[in-house]
Amino acid sequence: MKTITAGLAALLLSTAASFAADAWKEAEVNGAKIYTDANGMTLYTYDKDEKGKSNCYDKCATNWPPLKAEAGAKADDEWSVVDRTDGTKMWAYDGKPVYTFIKDKKPGDVTGDGVGEVWHIVKA
């Protein structure tokens, strides 16, 4: 029974770690190393957010979809999970929630960088 319990615990830990590893990746765009979501879409931070707290909801979140964290997702190095007021969870890099941008149409697009002087690419 101990072997089964230990095996199950190891499986659960590896599954949680894989959620983290599958949520984002490093990419090189225009000679710069950045973070993207699993589909290669550029990730951004929002100056109006606080560490560990998203302030992007409603229309903001429609235009800047949060990088959602799966149930059971765990922090990984500089990455953490933020609870949103709508009950969902999202990823944060160095404590800052991260988002994609609706106007980025294909991997490598960086059209959200500098929008309103408050959106910035997450650099790796």
Where do the model's predicted regions map?
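Low-complexity intrinsically disordered segments
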Residues: M1-K2, L12
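Compact beta-sheet-dominated domain cores in extracellular/mature segments
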Residues: K2-G7, F19-A124
